[in-house]
Amino acid sequence: TTSSQSVMKDMATALKTPSVWVVAIVIFTIYATYSASSYMQPYCETVLGMSAVAAGYVGILRKDAIRLLGAPISGFISEKMGGRCALLIGIFDILFIISLAILLVLPVGAQYTVVTVVILVATSFAIYGMRGMYYAIIDEIGTPKKIYGAVAGFAMFIGFLPDAFNSTLCGYWLDAYPGAQGYRNIFIYMLVLIIVNVILIGILLRYISKNKEQIRKNQQELKGEVAE
C-alpha cells in the first residue's frame, strides 16, 4: 500500500543518515551500561563482603532514590543549559569514566567500602541522568518531522539490543572468572561503552555546531506540527 511504501521510504532515508546511526549507538551504549550496572549490588555483597541487608540498602539508594532524582535533576540542568542535552550527556560521561576508573584501581577491602559506595552512587547518578535525556537528542540534532517516527523507532530498536545479550555476557564473565575478576570485567565493559559514548557525543556536538541553521528550521517545523 501507499502507506507502507511511505513508511519504508522514511526508514530508508533514516538509515542513510549518519547522525541517526550515531544517536542510535549513543542510546545503545547508555542502555547497555545501565543494564550492566545491575551487577553493582551483588558486587557489594559478593566482593566487598557487605551483608545482604547492607547491599540491599545500597541497591535501594542506587536504583530507587538515584533513579527518581537523576532524570529530573538532569532535565533541570539541561534546561538551564539551553536544552543542550548532548553536552550534558558528555559531562555525565566524564563523571562516569572518572568514577569507574577510580573503582577499577581501588583495592578491595573493608576500609574502602564507603569510598566504593560513593563511587557506585556517582556512576548511578550519571547513568540515570543520561537515560533521562537520550531521546531528547533525536530532536536536538534537528531530525526532520517527515522521518521523526522512523528515526525514533530505529534508535529504540538499536538502543535496546543489549537486552538480547547483556545478561548472557555478564553471566559468562561471572562464571568464568569467579569473584572480583568477573565483576572487574563487567566494569571494564561498562567503561569501554561510555568511552565510545563520549566519542560519539563529541561527533554529535560537532554536527550540531556545523548545522545550526538547518537544525533550527527542522525544530521549528516540528514544533509547528505539534502545535497544530
Label each residue range with its predicted role.
Residues 142-178:
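A late C-terminal transmembrane helix in Major Facilitator Superfamily
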Residues 24, 56-57, 90, 149, ...:
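Conserved glycine-rich helix-kink/hinge and helix-boundary motifs of the Major Facilitator Superfamily
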Residues 85, 169-194:
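A membrane-interface helix-boundary motif in multi-pass transporters
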Residues 17-75, 131, 136, 166-167:
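Extracytoplasmic gate region of multi-pass secondary transporters
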Residues 1-23, 221-228:
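Juxtamembrane intracellular "pre-TM" segments in multi-pass secondary transporters
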Residues 103-104, 183-222, 226-228:
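Multi-pass alpha-helical transporter architecture, strongest
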Residues 70-83, 174-175:
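Helix-to-loop junctions at the C-terminal end of transmembrane segments
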Residues 84-137:
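C-terminal transmembrane helical hairpin of 12-TM major facilitator-type secondary transporters
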